[in-house]
Amino acid sequence: MLSMFMCNNIVDYVDDIDNGIVQDIEDEASNNVDRDYVYPLPENMVYRFDKSTNILDYLSTERDHVMMAVRYYMSKQRLDDLYRQLPTKTRSYIDIINIYCDKVSNDYNRDMNIMYDMASTKSFTVYDINNEVNTILMDNKGLGVRLATISFITELGRRCMNPVKTIKMFTLLSHTICDDCFVDYITDISPPDNTIPNTSTREYLKLIGITAIMFATYKTLKYMIG
C-alpha cells in the first residue's frame, strides 16, 4: 500500500502541472488584445464533452500547432519523469489498473459508449461529477463499480479539450475513487513479488459480474440525463 507521504507527493506533482498550465493561460491572456477578458478559474469551469469535437478546430494557425506540440512535449516529459520516480510497488499497481480498466472498457464498450454519448449532451462542473461518483461509491463497495468509474472518467478526460479542466478532474476524482475499499481490492490482487498474473487477472475480473458494471452505468446515465 502506498504511504500517505507518497500519495501527497504525487498529488503535489500533479498540482504543479495544474498550476503551470494556469500560469500559461494567464500569460497568454496578458498578451491578448482584449485585455479586459477574464479567464475563468479551473474550479468554476463547466465541462462540456462532445464526441464530435475535432482538435483541428482548435489548431487553426501555425502558432497553435507549435504551441500544442510544445505543451505536449513538456507534459509528457513531466509525466515520464514522475513515472521514473515511482517505486516498483506503485508501478505494479499501475499495471493492474491498466489491465482491469482496459478489460472493462473492452467488455462493456457498448454500455460505456452510451454513457459517453449522454455526457456529451450535458454541462456540469468537476464538483458535480465528484459528488455523484462519491454517492455511487458510498452506496456500493464492489470493485466493478470502481473500475467502471475509472474507465468512464478517463474517457471523459480524453474528450475534454481543456488540459486544465482535465487535470483538475483527474486529481479530484483520484482522491474520491481511491477509498479504503479500492485500496484493499488492489493490494489483495497485487501478488507479493509485484508481478502481474496473466491468466488469473482475467478470470478474477469475470467474477465481478455484469451487475456491478451495469449499476454504475445506470447511476451515471440517470445523473447525466437528469
UniProtKB/Swiss-Prot annotation:
InterPro entries: Bcl-2-like_sf (IPR036834), Orthopox_F1 (IPR011207), Poxvirus_F1/C10 (IPR021119). Induction: Expressed in the early phase of the viral replicative cycle. Signal peptide: none annotated. It is found in: Host mitochondrion outer membrane; Host cytoplasm. The keyword Hydrolase does not apply. One of its GO terms (cellular component) is membrane. Keywords: Host cytoplasm, Host membrane, Host mitochondrion, Host mitochondrion outer membrane, Host-virus interaction, Inhibition of host apoptosis by viral BCL2-like protein, Membrane, Modulation of host cell apoptosis by virus. GO terms for biological process: regulation of apoptotic process; symbiont-mediated suppression of host apoptosis. Belongs to the orthopoxvirus OPG045 family. Plays a role in evading host innate immune response by inhibiting host inflammasome activation. Interacts with and inhibits NLR-mediated interleukin-1 beta/IL1B production in infected cells. At the host mitochondria outer membrane, interacts with the BH3 domain of host BAK and prevents BAK from binding active BAX. In turn, host apoptosis is inhibited. Homodimer. Interacts with host pro-apoptotic protein BCL2L11 (via BH3 domain). Interacts with host NLRP1. Interacts with host BAK. This is Apoptosis regulator OPG045. The lineage of its organism: Viruses, Varidnaviria, Bamfordvirae, Nucleocytoviricota, Pokkesviricetes.
